[in-house]
Amino acid sequence: PAAYGTDFGVILKPSDKILINIAAWYLYLDQEFVYVGDAGVVEPSGKSKRQGIDVTTRFQFTKNLFANANFNFTKPRAVGEPKGANYIPLAPTFTSVGGVYYKAQKGLNGGINYRYIKNRPANEDNSVVAKGYFLLDAAVNYTRPKYEIGLAFENIFNIKWNEAQFATESRLRNEPAPVTELHYTPGTPFFARLKLAVFF
């Protein structure tokens, strides 16, 4: 199936320490594919369109201290469906990633970064919602010419979040009929990892 898209963007550099990229875009698909949880496959669901704005920022505070943040705004809709029943299941509407990093060729280096996704429709009428999340990860390393020792932390605040999630029918033993509701795989809880690397 055909896909048609266009975008327009600008790159701004207000100073030698700041870089900003802003792009507006539009995408039209002759055929959208939607994940079917029960079957574990994707199936065609008609035409769709998306329009959005992406913002990318980069900052350099010092020779070794950096930061970045990306913001992605999207309005995804099915074409030819009535308003209120034209949502695209699981299509993100707002996501963002970013962080602050200290980078050095040797000695201590590391950073902290975040991941965010907003609540989004899990079915066509938005009666079932896929839950968003905000997670923080961090890492610190000690680097020498011959080796590196590091410690990484995922989900620092031990937030309960859903990783894979979708709307599908299920029925418990005491229920008279199947119910369409959110099914999900729990996301990784707080996790720490020790790293040792040897350079040859």
Please describe what each predicted stretch is.
Residues N123-V129, L136-V140, E181-L182:
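Short, glycine/charged-rich beta-strand-loop motifs at protein surfaces that mediate ligand recognition
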Residues A67, N119-R120, Y142-F200:
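C-terminal beta-signal and adjacent terminal beta-strands/loops
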Residues A2-T6, K47-Q51, L90-S96, G132-L136, ...:
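Residues that define the transmembrane beta-barrel architecture of outer-membrane proteins
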Residues P14-D16, F61-K63, K75, K106, ...:
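Short coil turns and loop connectors of transmembrane beta-barrels in diderm outer membranes
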